Amino acid sequence: MGHEEELSPEQVDLKVSPLMGSLKRTWNDFCATSSIHGLRYTRDEDTNRIVHFVWLLISLVMFICAVVMARTFYIDFRSNPTRMNVESDNTPVNTLYFPPVTICPDVLFNMQKSEAFLQTLQLPQGTNQSVILRKLHIFYGFMLDDEKYSEQDTSLMESLLSLNNLTLQQLVEHLRWNCDEILYRCRFNGQIRDCLELFQLSKTFFGHCCSFNLRQTGLNFTAERAVGGLKYGLSVILRYKDDSYDPVQSYSFGVKLLIQESDAFPSAHSSSKFIAFNSEVFAAIRPQETFCSPAVKALSIEDRNCVFRNEFKMRYFKNYVYPNCELNCRVTNMVKFCNCHTYFFDFNRTTDRICTFKDIPCLVDNFANIISRKRSTQCYCPLTCEHLDYDVQISDFPLKLNMPVGDQFYSGINKNDGILHVFINSFGYRRLRHDLLSNMVTLVSNLGSAFSLFVGMSMLSVVEIMYYFSVILRKNYVLECEARKKMLHKGPKFAWPKANDSHSKHQKSVFIIHKM
């Protein structure tokens, strides 16, 4: 490429401005020497204007295609920047806590305790202990909408509270099960242990239950580590300590087993299984952990489409996991529609009123709104970036009393007992890494591939464009201005018009320029 140090008069077009002339000259130089495919043919002197136009059109179409593909790459990068990779299928399970185990009696209250406590209370006029016991099923109105409860029933239970100066929570404390009334014998990690050392009374969506290794406000987190295999799991003999328990009348003969993350509130979101009495049940657990790479942690919430536990605050629950957010929405709707929330959601984090029997009709009537069946009552609950999932497989067998076993754990079992074994079925577990689908290097590589495929551009081509339309453009502009100045300084020939020109009222100068 050669650039003239001085332009001849024939190379200067006085019909356009110096800037336009220098731009045109720079464009011609760029097309003649550019590495971009097709541009040189748009200024080929050996072809006509039709060929020039065709090549210009082809180059323009190819450039548009490159831009469209590059935009597609960028949109994909922004809309779905992450992916899941299996980091390991054999991570040692002893790096995890043992999965939280919650055991809930399938009947809300210990009837033997309830009868004894009601004998100490002043009962409403015209009623007796048997009537009150039959009305205890009204507590299901705090949880479900299966039944409509009459105003007479709710008023009767309200009067029971007021006559004895009791709150609903105090009444529940005297009626509920204790853990030693459900759990007869426990074994963990191969050793028989006191059940009350392992299990603590917890609040759940199903009322009061007994939980092991659960992190909940008011509980001491035992932080027991996991070990693979049946021998090192948790075994429990289940036996109701309630002489008044009638499985026919209660329509139940067993307990609920709930397994979820240690920070999650036990609820319908948990992995729930029914453990029947007069059987031996084996619950084999396979954990799966999802965690994030440092690159994903550095992304914004909008880009990774998930949150960490300290990034999303809730009113009624301390620790953020997705099930807790759904329940937080449920409690919020309770307060919104009924101005109270149920007793098992009381963690002393707010001053909201606790629902009593008089609020049950409101809770039942607004059940669809409370559990967010309608879009208008749904809440925003982002997914958690890091979490543990538990796949629970159940195997159950009839309980054999006369089977010769040398294990002291089985001594003294009764025919109506239930035996539960919860264990991790492998010494290793799967870890999934939430990683970047592509980083900035990959994005730049994809963009470069698009432009290279269609127009043959590279980063060097970008530098070339910048060079031509800065350095070379300035040089051409200076040459253009100098050439025009020299043409004017050579003194063009001109003539004055005659003084008696009748076609003009004012004297005008008419320049007649002759080419030199």
Swiss-Prot record:
Domain of life per record: Eukaryota
Keyword Hydrolase: no
Gene3D superfamilies with a match to the protein in the record: Acid-sensing ion channels like domains (2.60.470.10), YojJ-like (1.10.287.770)
Main subcellular localisation: membrane
Membrane topology type: Multi-pass membrane protein
Localization per Swiss-Prot or TrEMBL: Membrane
Residues that span the membrane, as ranges: 50-70, 453-473
A Pfam family that the UniProt record links to this protein: ASC
Gene Ontology BP term (one): liquid clearance, open tracheal system
Gene from which this protein is expressed: Nach
Cytoplasmic side: 1-49, 474-516
Function summary: Part of a complex that plays a role in tracheal liquid clearance. Probable role in sodium transport.
The protein's name: Sodium channel protein Nach
UniProtKB keywords: Glycoprotein, Ion channel, Ion transport, Membrane, Sodium, Sodium channel, Sodium transport, Transmembrane, Transmembrane helix, Transport
GO molecular function: ligand-gated sodium channel activity
Positions annotated with a glycan in the UniProt record: 128, 165, 220, 348
Homology family: Belongs to the amiloride-sensitive sodium channel (TC 1.A.6) family.
Cellular-component GO terms for this entry: plasma membrane
Topology, Extracellular side: 71-452
Keyword Kinase carried by entry: no
